[in-house]
Amino acid sequence: MADIKLIARRVESMKHRAYERDTQMANILAVRQGKMVEIFPDMFPEGMSHAMVANFIDVAARDLAEVLAPLPSINCSTTNVTSDNAREFADKRSMIANNYVYTSRLQTQMYPGSDQYFSYGFLPIHVEADWDSKLPRIRVEDPTGVYYERDRFGRLVAYAKRYNKTLIELVNEFPENDRALLGQFGYDQNLNQEIEIIRYMDKDSIVLYVPSRKDLVLSIAANPMGKMTVVVAERPSIDGKARGQFDDVVFVQLARARFANLAMEAAEKSIQAPLVVPDDVLDMPMGPDAIIRTTNPNGVGRVRLDIPAATFQEQSALQSELRLGARYPE
């Protein structure tokens, strides 16, 4: 049986190597959720919870996902087109293959899966045995918290997925480990605190354990298939590291949001600029339709706030850079 200590060290090594990737994935997720202010709080004024520009990255990702998600038609062919038996056999194989896709709801899964593929740069897809229906099930998994290793031939040799569950959920699902999960405080603690659990798989074993509880093993079993039942589709990259399509345009989106804030601030200051009046004005009436008596009406006005025209040109340039970096032309 697998050694949990070796597995835990291997998973920690994979997590350490993917630290930069995890940070970038968290930034992309926050930007797509409209939480750019939480990532770069110094770039936004106080009291502003969202950026004042359209979320271009989210719009582009959804649009590209809708293009990639539709599945091709699945048809099996035969080398002997003159044989009725061969054609019937090919038709039956086509029906079987399409039934696998239909029962797995693969078409429905491909829309969020394609979205995550563009956003994060890779997508795990499981092919698991459904022993109840006696059918293979295809499952698309969220890449967040996924770590994996390949051998020199590019084959997957280790796969780990990080989940978060509340303490009470784990106790209810694994009552035999309640003492180890709850610890010395028992039920007299915050049972809604989230606990990280790891599901690890290789060709020999499948393990579910809790790192924060001294690598407590919740479930361990031999891999019934004897091989990896997951594949990871990756976007092509020059250095072999997974990179999302929008990794390079996050800061361009930030610059657009920053320019929008500055433009709004400039407009506000222009409207609220101090009032300039000639020296002969002794009484300053305020309010709508107020009358200012002066012999020099041309001297009455607000302090001008000159905004360079290049500011608005730069906003257009940032929009072009955003489309170029995201490979999303007009």
Mark where each language-model region is:
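Long, contiguous amphipathic alpha-helices that act as assembly "spine/axial" helices in icosahedral shell
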Residues: 42, 53, 61, 88-129, ...
